[in-house]
Amino acid sequence: MKIALLEPIGVSKEVIDELSAPITEKGHEFVYYDTKTTDPAELAKRSEGCDIVMIANNPYPTEVVEKADALKMLSVAFTGIDHIGTDKCKEKNIMICNAAGYSNQTVAELIIGMAIDALRHVVKADGLVRNGGTSAGLGGKEICGRTVGIIGLGQIGLMAAKLFQAFGAKVIAYNRSESEEAKALGIEYKSLEEVLSTSDIVSLNLPLNAETRGFLSADKIALMNENTIFINCARGPIVDNLSLIHI
């Protein structure tokens, strides 16, 4: 069996060798590419004769899947799979394995970190001090007492909600279904319009798919207060980013 990792994944060659040793010891061929490419022709070349291809967030479009005649499984070291030609994979009976949930806590904590930075001007103050200035005039605010709106109350959204509550925030949420666990935590479900218009901090946590692409359109973005902190730790195309820039 031929297995190929088509892109670097942020670890050393020594780690790759250690992790791939059990594969090669069983007689399988393992190939590692330490450069990233989005060129379909190069991706197709790297995939030639492969039974299993591994990627992270590198695009693997339909035209590449089409040419991968030996491919049986596509292993994705990433949560989302919107960068893959999934329809063609289904058509060719190619199994897709992704790493759903591998970084839920990490992303939830990142959301909190971004909120703290936006409220307390951490990065800006750091830059000023490093250049001989002071943080004078950068009055900060607290999460405590703020209303936080979570759009998409899945695993990441719920984890972030719990963390915000630990800071003393009131959490409201918009989700297409309601969770008894969330209700037990005191999270209030609201309409999307109410979440956007009444929240001091809005955290977007939806997956990217055909239904959510462009979900946060210009008219919805306009519902937010000019002082609202908007955090998108989901995927960029869920938001009309041009409208976000200009509003």
What are these regions (language model features)?
Residues M1-C50, I172:
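N-terminal glycine-/charge-rich "phosphate-binding" loop or analogous flexible N-terminal tail
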Residues A4, M73-S75, M95-C97, I172, ...:
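Structural detector of well-ordered beta-strand residues that form the stable sheet scaffold
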Residues K13, D17, T37-L43, N58-T62, ...:
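Structural motif corresponding to alpha-helix initiation and N-cap regions
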Residues G49-D126, H246:
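Phosphate/diphosphate ligand-binding glycine-rich loop within oxidoreductases
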Residues T62-V65, S177-I245:
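Rossmann-like adenosine-cofactor binding region
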Residues K92-I94, A99-T147, K162, A166, ...:
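Phosphate-binding beta-alpha-beta segment of Rossmann-like dinucleotide-binding domains, i.e.
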Residues L153-G154:
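Glycine-rich Rossmann-fold phosphate-binding loop(s) that bind the pyrophosphate
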